[in-house]
């Protein structure tokens, strides 16, 4: 590429890092790293009403957890928060006012609301009507004096070129254009409190920080013509724009909503549940982009190498919680035991299960886990007297030969000495029950598994029985025999 790549992720510190914002950050990160460019973070905190205490720290902490790093940010550079750049915004506000490209607007919220209501009743498209329309210079001066005498604080509006055409070649969606007359009239670039509006400040920031490419969600498409107006008014070259498609819920087919309880939507949720960051990073990278081929598991380094902005999807990206869980399970299975055990320790400790067998339990159930917090429900059988059964499990235990199998296997366990009770000796005892009773296959193994573990599926049965212990295994079988004899 001919020009230096400089991209940014510019969150508002209004709460936790959402999966959609994480995707925006991640695609900018991959784009910069792939092209040897600069990835920076800027905090857009001009909306003081939505500001959340500690929101900035939370955003950066969760980005780091995902595995991203950056070259410039408020941590290392001055004036990378919009609230620290008010003088710069004012400089360009004053310039536009002096050049007649912007003006002070004294219309009140009540007047704006009344005009919107009139337009709605008349079936007109809502838009701001210039309050100075038809006024002479003397009338305009008198109007301003009257408003200021009444204590009305003005906003500043950009004078829109109604006949202008604002177009760009979008990196994702191709050619897009808007007519200046369809923007809604002259729009506010500075609020009454002196803070700039988003669409003004973002242009000043992107130009000042020499941003070359703006990659963001397609909910920002409608903002782009307004931003192009500011670039035009100030005589600046605009960056390239790319608008990623929406993320939809794979089950409903609708835009992902915070009300969708079947999905975890905040990065903090994944951290707390014990997902591996590499898995979440991998999953998010494939939301609206793919490198081609059948593979879906990629390291961060592989994703950086493979990233190609030309493969960003034009179709909505489906957020599939089941796919993420499958991917997470793959990462956990292939992670080293020490890593997963360290992640499991807080969960085990809180549940009072950080015993001398804890690491063995993690090793036993690691292949089943989608998130590390699942170590608690998976190991319930080791810390309870009688496991809760599902309807399917209860149905298995109504089989005619179940009592025979359980009585025979209980007798085998009771006959074993402590020295004999080791993993490799347990399977032969099950086979001995088969030989004695003539019962085999599922009719043999399933009742033993359910009686001991309360599960129809799980780790190797001898491993489970050994970790559970001889006495507790016998106790579980006795409890099950009592239950099925009722």
From Swiss-Prot:
Gene Ontology CC, one term: cytosol
UniProt cross-references to CDD domains, sorted A to Z: GluRS_core
GO molecular function: ATP binding; glutamate-tRNA ligase activity; tRNA binding; zinc ion binding
Pfam family, one: tRNA-synt_1c
Subcellular location per the Swiss-Prot or TrEMBL entry: Cytoplasm
InterPro entries for this protein: aa-tRNA-synth_I_cd-bd, aa-tRNA-synth_I_codon-bd_sub2, aa-tRNA-synth_I_CS, aa_tRNA-synth_I_cd-bd_sf, Glu-tRNA-ligase_bac/mito, Glu/Gln-tRNA-synth, Glu/Gln-tRNA-synth_Ib_cat-dom, GluQ/Sye
GO BP annotation list: glutamyl-tRNA aminoacylation
Catalytic activity: tRNA(Glu) + L-glutamate + ATP = L-glutamyl-tRNA(Glu) + AMP + diphosphate
EC number of the protein: 6.1.1.17
Locus of motif 'KMSKS' region: 255-259
Chief location: cytoplasm
Residue ranges annotated as motif 'HIGH' region: 11-21
Keyword Protein biosynthesis recorded: yes
Residues holding ATP: 258
UniProtKB keywords: Aminoacyl-tRNA synthetase, ATP-binding, Cytoplasm, Ligase, Nucleotide-binding, Protein biosynthesis
Tagged with keyword Transmembrane: no
Subunit structure as annotated in this protein's UniProt entry: Monomer.
Task of the protein: Catalyzes the attachment of glutamate to tRNA(Glu) in a two-step reaction: glutamate is first activated by ATP to form Glu-AMP and then transferred to the acceptor end of tRNA(Glu).
PANTHER family: GLUTAMATE--TRNA LIGASE (PTHR43311), GLUTAMATE--TRNA LIGASE, MITOCHONDRIAL-RELATED (PTHR43311:SF2)
Family recorded in the similarity comment: Belongs to the class-I aminoacyl-tRNA synthetase family. Glutamate--tRNA ligase type 1 subfamily.
Protein name: Glutamate--tRNA ligase
Organism: Streptococcus pneumoniae serotype 19F (strain G54)
